[in-house]
From Swiss-Prot:
One of its GO terms (cellular component) is cytosolic large ribosomal subunit. GO terms for biological process: translation. Coiled coil: none annotated. This is Large ribosomal subunit protein uL22. InterPro entries: Ribosomal_uL22, Ribosomal_uL22_bac/chlpt-type, Ribosomal_uL22_bac/org-type, Ribosomal_uL22_CS, Ribosomal_uL22_sf. This protein binds specifically to 23S rRNA; its binding is stimulated by other ribosomal proteins, e.g. L4, L17, and L20. It is important during the early stages of 50S assembly. It makes multiple contacts with different domains of the 23S rRNA in the assembled 50S subunit and ribosome. The lineage of its organism: Bacteria, Pseudomonadati, Pseudomonadota, Alphaproteobacteria, Rickettsiales.
Length: 119
């Protein structure tokens, strides 16, 4: 069943093994971009996390096309938000019998694509 009253689709990627600060660099880069241009930029980005962001964006495009029947040539990325997820705590042995804590951060990514109206 295709709903035509909504003109936006979302996708999310949860518990990504990267800090929110690093993920936000890529998310802010693609915000307010056409999806075709964003896919090209993410394909050739040197950032390690760009592949996961690209997969999430392709999921949002597929949701827009298959669930809502939107035209993928007119889609733009309206929201690309990053949130904190769990923090995995680890121990690193140090000198003289001491130990320090290592925090391994995880992130959540939410992408919303909207069909641009013709004016």
């Amino acid at each position: 069943m295709i709903q035509k009253n909504k003109n936006f689709a979302t996708a999310k990627a949860k518990s990504i093994r990267v800090s929110p600060r690093k993920l936000n660099l890529v998310a802010s880069f693609i915000r307010n971009m056409k999806v075709s241009e964003a896919l090209v930029q993410l394909t050739f980005s040197p950032k390690r996390i760009a592949k996961i962001v690209k997969d999430c964006l392709q999921s949002a495009i597929a949701n827009a096309e298959n669930n809502l029947g939107l035209d993928i040539d007119r889609l733009i990325i309206t929201k690309a938000t990053v949130g904190k997820s769990v923090v995995m705590k680890r121990i690193m042995p140090r000198a003289k019998g001491r130990a320090t804590r290592i925090n391994k951060f995880f992130s959540n990514l939410y992408i919303t694509v909207t069909e641009k109206e013709d004016n």
